[in-house]
Amino acid sequence: MKKTLVLGVLAPGLLVAMQAAQAQEMLPEIQVVADTPLQGRGIDRDKVPSTITTVHADDFQRAASPNITDTLFQRVPGVSLSDPNGNSAQQEIRYRGFAASPLQGTPQGLAVYMNGIRLNEAFGDTVNWDLIPTNAIQQADVFTNNPIFGLNALGGAVNLTPKNGFTWQGFEQEISGGSYGRVQGGLQFGAESGNWSTYIAAQGMQDQGWRQKSPTQLGRFYGDIGWRDDKAEFHLFGSVATSSFGVAAATPIEMLNRDWSSVYTTPQTTQNNTALLGLNGKYALTDNWTLQGSLYGRFFRQSHVDGNDGDFERCSNSSSYANHLCLEDDGFARPVPFTGAAALAFRNQFAILDANNQPIPCPPGAGNTCGTVPYGTIDRTNTRSTTFGGSLQATNEEKLFGHGNRFVIGGSIDRGNTDFNGSSTLGYIFPDLSVGTNPAIPGMGSVIHTLGDVGFAPLSITSRNTYYGIYATDTFDITDRLAATAGVRYNIADITVRDILGTSPDLNSDSRFSRLNPVGGLTYKILPGLTAYAGYSESNRAPTPLELGCSNPNKPCLLESFLVSDPPLKQVVGHTYEVGLRGTSALWGGSLNWKAGLFRTDSTDDIITLASSIAGRGYYQNVPETRRQGVELSAEYKSSQWMVYASYSYIDATYRFSGDLASPNNPMADDDGNIHVVPGNHIPGIPQHQFKAGVDYMVTAEWKVGADLIAVGQQYFVGDDSNQNPKLPAYAVVNLHTSYQVSKNVTLFANINNLFNNKYALYGTYFDPSGGAAKAGLPITLTDQRTLVPGMPFAIYGGIRVKL
């Protein structure tokens, strides 16, 4: 860490000297950003006491990816990419170690907004990046150290600004295709007429997937109608999107060694649908006061089917259900003393019952045993959420005591209603690892539950969460170089959960979480093109309805699925410190922009996900303290012929406590399935080192070529919180792209991903190789507990773009 900190301090020094030489040659253009979710009168970027990274529309087009996460990963220092779902359209990003993920079960530490609307889903704060059309994005601003964005902004916030007819005019259509059966297309149209504007964007994509049984289909639409005059501007906008995926997920490493495209148990599919309607606007009350506001309604539906390994065994002869099917009881705490009625009740609770509440017998013959049957389950969940809300904000830019000043006050309300149901059916794992039914085996295809509702229990619940926020922030120019910012946001989260079936009354709960989060900092303009900043803030996130219902290790949940009665969770509080430099200067006929910073976020009562001994299940737990600290360095040079960028990030993400955590499939786990964590152990799934670089070169006025390099360091497997096992290896990927403008309106383009066809993994965790799949007749015997999500091999795509 010391060497990295020295690098973070010294590297900007070279650029500072350059700034001094260039100071007289240029006056940097003022860049205005919106530092609150609502788009209104922004603020000079150099007066914001934290890091801001902006990704522009050209960057999304340059990446030529249907996934917004690919571009954020490529262009934002400190953003890493993970893929626990095993599908490139459903990847998650982690910024400074905090996640924004579509996966239920991932604790979410980033707030995501579009048009002032919170995109974190109501039920689990997840972010479904696949539902956002990339061609409709004008820019994406990634903020740190800013609690004004409300809940989940522990690591920062991503604020997406879509295009409209005032900011984008014309017509553009493109179609492309290539490896693994991919065909994708998009169009956008924008027009301005008098006070009115219109904008629409649409995208579609179909891909068979490079891994087995991993097809993808996407359809996305965004539209905007705007009106403005000298004092006001209003936009009515809406979007609809649908997506379906084959979710290949992680595969045992021994299977990948035989076939890099192999998958473990199937089916694994996810289908998402969403619709959004919103209205936002701003109105100039006076020369100094501006009012901004938004209203919205949003619908989201998700259906998930997951074929899983079955952790079943023949019931104990000491139970009331000998020669019947039971859930394996390994990993569950036995009562003390383990005798008599207590022992009998413990064993009986694991008996598997069918939809008619009857125990399921073992198949006849072979000693009437269940132990040789490759049992599996098909788990199904459905989530339907309706969210609506609004926000109102006032901005004043009147001078205070003769000094420049910007004051913002606002508030927001977001309310979500969710209906959720989940169930498991008993299945049979065939040699190809597909989970289906076998009529020769009793209980096949029946919805199952355990006698004690442990691990398996049909569920139907409704939840309601209402989030209130009120905030104020002020930036005061102490001098023409020195600006001070101070602000505060008060969050209230009311969360209600109700059991619809009436079979799990312990699920019924009413919870309230609240907190006042301050922010403060200073910026100092050392030179016209060089600014120093320092800031401090606090932020919080409340446990989600999913997390509140899934924190009991004795009743684990199928993540993305079942909820159970549980001990309460505490809200997470983050304390962030940040210092840095940023600058811009003229260089070699172009412009150079750079930034360098140090950061630290200490989180108390952090929520983490822990695995259960039951396949596919886990639970949530507060841990006393975690720390994420590090360095970010980045620079970008642009001229008429060149674009060059490079960034480096170092993230030291560690636990700051001693204690036992559950990780039953970890090779180093003790007899109780636990591992021991001590202060300084690294949080799994977060690479310490990342280096990214790219270049574009205009060979001629019509022909452009470019390349990108992404190098990611080692990281610990998820589940190796004690850092006792080998790490997930580092990797590097080189991508190429080119475009040729055939005429004024027509451009041909092509992309190559993973030029050198490197084999690498985006995610690693552990599994139990002795489960039901081990009895399915596999051609190899699985013994290695490591399981990986492999990265995509060499792929090439090409297309045509027409712009009028």
Language-model features: locations:
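Gram-negative outer-membrane beta-barrel transporters
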Residues: Q393-T395, F401, T479-D480, A484, ...
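Membrane-embedded beta-barrel scaffold of Gram-negative outer-membrane proteins
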Residues: A284, T290-Y296, F300-H304, K525, ...
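Extracytoplasmic beta-strand/coil segments of soluble accessory domains associated
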Residues: D44, F73-I117, E121
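Surface-exposed extracellular loop regions of Gram-negative outer-membrane beta-barrel proteins
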Residues: T242-R258, N417, D494-D499, D510, ...
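A beta-strand signature from Gram-negative outer-membrane beta-barrel systems
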Residues: L119-E121, D130-E174, Q184
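Face-selective signature of the C-terminal outer-membrane beta-barrel domain
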Residues: E233, N273-V305, D309-D311, C315-R498, ...
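Transmembrane beta-barrel wall of Gram-negative outer-membrane proteins
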Residues: G177-Q206, R211-A248, P267-T290, G487-R489, ...
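C-terminal beta-signal and adjacent terminal beta-strands/loops
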Residues: N540, T609, I710-D720, S739-L804
